[in-house]
């Protein structure tokens, strides 16, 4: 394992038990947690993106703010729902945030997850083309986004512009060259992982996927990663791909940890449906003393296959506690798994 970061779902609720009671709380604490994680030596700060929910949504203002406050840590998403995105406008936003961060963005994109509303992308002005599903539309938006990130001119210039143009067709500005290689696809199935490999995207595999074989979650996820790497090699890309997996992992160090996570729940995979047609398997959580955690995680085949591990954090418990969660893993667990 080469890198470890955190993944925040960015929840807020007006409950008195929550440390994030407003959108402002969540946004500002997300920045502070990224700063704290960098100081602790973590490698990445990643954020979920959900629309129509009390969670983080359009991510680029947050990513830019984190980029301005940090200097080393990778900054990313897991994932942006491409059904909601104007891919050209997204190139401009993503490039601006990447330039502010000095080329540290790692953008996870996908077709999205189950929504809070029915066909929410329609309210954003998007419709699948005739014969397209909404998932097809998301993948089409993704391919346009990837093409535009190449930085090639495509727009006919005005012969009488307000400001002088460079020669030839014009491209989107700003375009951050190099960001194209730091785009990840959140794949929920083996087929979409292979598709992502062919297009030269890195792979994000989360805490759930389509249940394709009935095997344990980590076994299926490891097989997905191997299929992805084989497709990448077959495609003949010049660089090595990156692969991340997400896990809920808590080292029980003190009484707070045991009170929050020491109840033994969710220690087995769960089966459910992410839509009426798709049976899904949800990966287990891990919560134990560090020596027990190390042995459990060594048996996780997908963690062994990946180069990046994202720790899902309970952001509503506040910056100080989540920094403690990250530090406990980095100090007491990660070195035994080959990190650093």
PLM regions and their residue ranges:
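N-terminal beta1-alpha1-beta2 module of alpha/beta enzyme domains
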Residues: 1-73
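Flexible, glycine-rich active-site loops centered on histidine and acidic residues
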Residues: 2-23, 84-154, 211
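Conserved, mostly hydrophobic/aromatic
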Residues: 4, 41, 49, 66, ...
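Hydrophobic faces of well-ordered beta-strands that scaffold small-molecule active sites
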Residues: 4-8, 45-47, 75-78, 105-109, ...
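Active-site mouth loops of central-metabolism enzymes
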Residues: 12-28, 80-87, 177-187, 280-291
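Glycine-rich, proline-tolerant flexible connector loops at the mouths of alpha/beta enzymes
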Residues: 44-66, 207-218, 310-323
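Alpha-helix-loop-beta-strand connector modules within alpha/beta enzyme cores
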Residues: 56-80, 327-340
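An alpha-helical appendage that flanks or caps ligand/catalytic pockets
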Residues: 128-172, 205-206, 213-307, 340
């Amino acid at each position: 394992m080469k890198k470890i970061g955190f993944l925040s779902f960015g929840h807020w609720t007006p409950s008195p038990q929550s440390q994030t009671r407003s959108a402002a709380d969540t946004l500002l604490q997300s920045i502070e947690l990224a700063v704290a994680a960098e100081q602790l030596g973590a490698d990445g700060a990643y954020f979920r993106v959900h629309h129509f929910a009390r969670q983080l949504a359009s991510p680029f203002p947050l990513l830019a703010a984190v980029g301005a406050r940090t200097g080393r840590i990778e900054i990313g998403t897991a994932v942006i729902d491409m059904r909601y995105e104007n891919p050209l406008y997204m190139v401009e936003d993503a490039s601006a945030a990447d330039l502010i961060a000095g080329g540290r963005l790692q953008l996870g994109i996908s077709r999205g997850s189950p929504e809070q509303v029915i066909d929410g992308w329609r309210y954003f002005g998007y419709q699948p083309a005739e014969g397209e599903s909404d998932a097809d539309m998301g993948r089409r938006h993704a391919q346009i986004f990837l093409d535009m990130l190449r930085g090639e001119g495509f727009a006919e210039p005005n012969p009488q512009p307000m400001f002088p143009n460079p020669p030839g067709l014009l491209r989107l500005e700003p375009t951050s060259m190099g960001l194209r290689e730091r785009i990840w696809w959140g794949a929920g199935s083996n087929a979409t992982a292979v598709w992502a490999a062919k297009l030269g995207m890195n792979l994000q595999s989360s805490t759930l996927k389509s249940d394709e074989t009935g095997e344990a979650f980590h076994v299926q996820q490891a097989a997905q990663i191997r299929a992805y790497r084989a497709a990448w090699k077959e495609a003949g890309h010049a660089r090595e791909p990156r692969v991340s997996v997400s896990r809920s992992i808590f080292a029980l160090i003190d009484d707070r940890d045991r009170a929050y996570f020491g109840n033994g729940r969710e220690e087995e995979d769960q089966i459910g449906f992410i839509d009426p047609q798709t049976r899904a398997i949800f990966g287990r959580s891990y919560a134990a003393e560090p020596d027990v955690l190390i042995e459990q995680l060594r048996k996780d085949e997908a963690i062994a296959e990946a180069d990046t591990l994202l720790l899902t954090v309970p952001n509503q418990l506040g910056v100080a506690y989540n920094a403690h969660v990250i530090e406990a893993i980095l100090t007491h667990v990660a070195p035994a798994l080959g990190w650093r």
